[in-house]
């Protein structure tokens, strides 16, 4: 019934989570050792992001989250995102929030961040 479906779609949360994903999330939150390691990794890697940004004259918005927001003022942030995607690295442009120079970048493992830094360094040099 289209009317009932429409009503249910208006009532549901914007991001549906199935029961398996919900159980996995609860289990992950109970794994305090994993959480501790993840928080430590994010903290250390966030410092590396800050150093990379400083070395490349980019502004990183202060954060305590599992991602950083980097201001690529003077560059075409969307073009950077596209070039990263072409290399298999996904970042999120914040154009929808009227932040055309900002990319949201998830903090990964050190090896993942190393790869991002290397690829991004080459892209920035190409775009100068």
Regions found by a protein language model. Give the residues of each.
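PLP-dependent aminotransferase class I/II
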Residues: 1-54, 58-61
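PLP-dependent enzyme catalytic core of the Aspartate aminotransferase-like
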Residues: 83-87, 92, 96-128
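A short, structure-level motif marking secondary-structure boundaries and short turns
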Residues: 33-36, 64-67, 109
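Phosphate- and divalent-cation-binding pockets in alpha/beta enzyme and binding domains
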Residues: 7, 24, 71, 79, ...
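Short loop/turn and capping residues at structural boundaries
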Residues: 19, 64-65, 95
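Structured loop/turn residues at secondary-structure junctions
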Residues: 13, 72-73, 108
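A generic structural signal for alpha-helix starts
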Residues: 3, 33, 75-76, 111
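Conserved PLP-binding catalytic core of the aspartate aminotransferase-like
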Residues: 43, 55-87, 103
